[in-house]
């Protein structure tokens, strides 16, 4: 049976936003367990980053939202027999055990009585303050039982692992990736430009259509916008900026024979706005060498900048061919060479060429950190300033991230049996990189947000 997320009961989504095995763990801890202490951290992963970026406020909002929704749904189970039965049926179906399903629902009702008396979960949560350069294996979120904890509810400490990781790792990983892109752009700006202010707009978020869900797209856009000002994910942040831009459906509307008219019409229609036009719907080199020169006066009369966007081809040669360039051989020219030839450029204080201020390049086809670095290095070798190009960073970068990029994990680090705490450390002999940190953490950078 096919089921979309919107068809699932909202309360069940809040109650069961976890891996199935979490429901059984309340039965598995030692009988004398009176408390647990768990920690979310990034242990280092496959991204090759020396450190990572962490945002306290985002993690706090996620945790408080998850806890709030969970508590509301727990109370709803007690007040709605139909919902209680639906919960029992769902758990029974998953585990094939009616008694297990019934007992889980009864346990949720026990928690509801606790919430009515204490008005919050018996948990204390601390979150590390924000940082742009944290060391891996730093405790980021700690959760333990509060003074109100009772043995029957100890399982709650680890119950939220799945939903917290699911909602935290992508945003924080995107922050780290966006920071690395910003630092790369600033490096080339410092080498070739008169200032670095333009780098705030030099990576534009193109990722929404390639993300796995609207929620993922919003997390990525919001994180991207902590370092850049541009995103085409309109809902992704309160300060997202974009410009008017065409796509192939617009550029092909008049057919190839009417391509000159298409460019002319759009330039005349938007003379006072920043405008981005796709140039490779047919023959990009014809556009650069014939159509745009015919419209030169229209381009130069504009009040704002015209951005030209190639959307296909070999990234190694498309924008600039580096030292292969031969002014007498147009097969060695890239996009920037045609624009320089037909519209001119100036030389900045560092001796690098800056295209006519009415023109720029946008390139967003399969963009990665490595491709950006390659293109900027080629431009530098040819004597062009890095400000001549804006990159569209899409799902090739942001959808290729996963939890292992930075190694986000949530692990039990201490257990209290009776009145005594014991450190807990996972240390698999088959993979030393998965060794967990152990103990409880008295870190002044951990700020209490719940309990």
Curated annotation (Swiss-Prot):
Positions bound to diphosphate: 209, 248, 309
Q: Which GO terms describe its molecular function?
A: nicotinamide phosphoribosyltransferase activity
SUPFAM superfamilies per record: Nicotinate/Quinolinate PRTase C-terminal domain-like
Q: Where does beta-nicotinamide D-ribonucleotide bind?
A: 232, 309-311, 364-365, 403
UniProt-listed Enzyme Commission number(s) = 2.4.2.12
**UniProt pathway annotation:** Cofactor biosynthesis; NAD(+) biosynthesis; nicotinamide D-ribonucleotide from 5-phospho-alpha-D-ribose 1-diphosphate and nicotinamide: step 1/1
Database matches in Gene3D superfamilies: Aldolase class I
According to UniProt, the reaction catalysed is: beta-nicotinamide D-ribonucleotide + diphosphate = 5-phospho-alpha-D-ribose 1-diphosphate + nicotinamide + H(+)
Q: Which GO terms describe its biological process?
A: NAD biosynthetic process
Give UniProt keywords alphabetically: Glycosyltransferase, Pyridine nucleotide biosynthesis, Transferase
Q: Could you tell me the superkingdom of the organism this chain comes from?
A: Bacteria
The family database entries (Pfam families) matched by this protein are listed as: NAPRTase
Q: State the InterPro entries in the record.
A: Aldolase_TIM (IPR013785), N/Namide_PRibTrfase (IPR041525), Nicotinamide_PRibTrfase (IPR016471), Nicotinate_pribotase-like_C (IPR036068)
Name the protein family.
Belongs to the NAPRTase family.
User: What is the protein's known function?
Assistant: Catalyzes the condensation of nicotinamide with 5-phosphoribosyl-1-pyrophosphate to yield nicotinamide mononucleotide, an intermediate in the biosynthesis of NAD.
Q: What is this protein called?
A: Nicotinamide phosphoribosyltransferase
The organism is: Mycoplasma pneumoniae (strain ATCC 29342 / M129 / Subtype 1)
* Upper taxonomic lineage: Bacteria, Bacillati, Mycoplasmatota, Mycoplasmoidales, Mycoplasmoidaceae
């Amino acid at each position: 049976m096919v089921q979309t997320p919107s068809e699932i009961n909202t309360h069940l989504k809040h109650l069961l936003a976890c891996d199935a095995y979490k429901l059984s763990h309340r039965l598995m801890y030692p009988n004398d367990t009176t408390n647990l202490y768990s920690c979310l951290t990034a242990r280092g992963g496959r991204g090759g980053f020396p450190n990572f970026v962490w945002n306290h406020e985002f993690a706090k909002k996620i945790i408080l939202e998850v806890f709030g929704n969970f508590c509301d749904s727990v109370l709803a189970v007690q007040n709605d027999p139909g919902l209680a039965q639906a919960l029992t049926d769902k758990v029974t179906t998953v585990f094939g055990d009616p008694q297990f399903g019934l007992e889980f629902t009864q346990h949720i009702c026990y928690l509801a009585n606790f919430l009515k008396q204490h008005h919050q979960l018996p948990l204390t949560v601390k979150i590390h303050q924000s940082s742009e350069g944290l060391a891996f294996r730093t405790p980021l979120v700690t959760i333990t039982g509060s003074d109100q904890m009772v043995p029957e509810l100890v399982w709650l400490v680890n119950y939220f692992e799945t939903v917290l990781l699911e909602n935290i790792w992508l945003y924080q990983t995107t922050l780290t990736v966006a920071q690395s892109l910003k630092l790369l752009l600033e490096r080339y700006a410092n080498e070739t430009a008169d200032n670095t202010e333009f780098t705030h707009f030099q990576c534009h978020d193109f990722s929404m259509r390639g993300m796995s869900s609207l929620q993922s797209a919003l997390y990525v856009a919001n994180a991207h916008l902590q370092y850049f000002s541009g995103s085409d994910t309109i809902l992704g942040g309160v300060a997202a900026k974009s410009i008017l831009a065409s796509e192939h459906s617009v550029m092909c509307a008049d057919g190839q024979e009417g391509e000159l008219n298409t460019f002319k019409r759009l330039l005349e229609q938007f003379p006072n706005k920043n405008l981005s036009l796709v140039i490779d719907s047919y023959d990009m080199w014809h556009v650069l060498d014939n159509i745009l020169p015919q419209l030169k006066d229209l381009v130069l009369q504009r009040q704002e900048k015209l951005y030209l966007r190639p959307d296909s081809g070999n990234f190694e040669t498309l924008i600039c061919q580096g030292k292969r360039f031969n002014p007498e051989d147009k097969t060695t020219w890239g996009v920037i060479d045609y624009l320089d030839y037909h519209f001119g450029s100036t030389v900045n204080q560092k001796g690098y060429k800056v295209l006519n201020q009415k023109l720029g390049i946008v390139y967003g086809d399969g963009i990665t950190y490595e491709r950006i670095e390659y293109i900027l290095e080629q431009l530098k070798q040819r004597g062009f300033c890095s400000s001549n190009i804006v990159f569209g960073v899409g799902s090739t970068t942001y959808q290729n991230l996963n939890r292992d990029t930075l190694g986000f994990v949530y692990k039990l680090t201490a257990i209290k049996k009776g009145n005594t705490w014991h450190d807990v450390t996972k240390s698999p002999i088959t993979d030393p990189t998965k060794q967990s940190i152990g103990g409880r953490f008295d870190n002044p950078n951990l700020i209490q947000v719940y309990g």
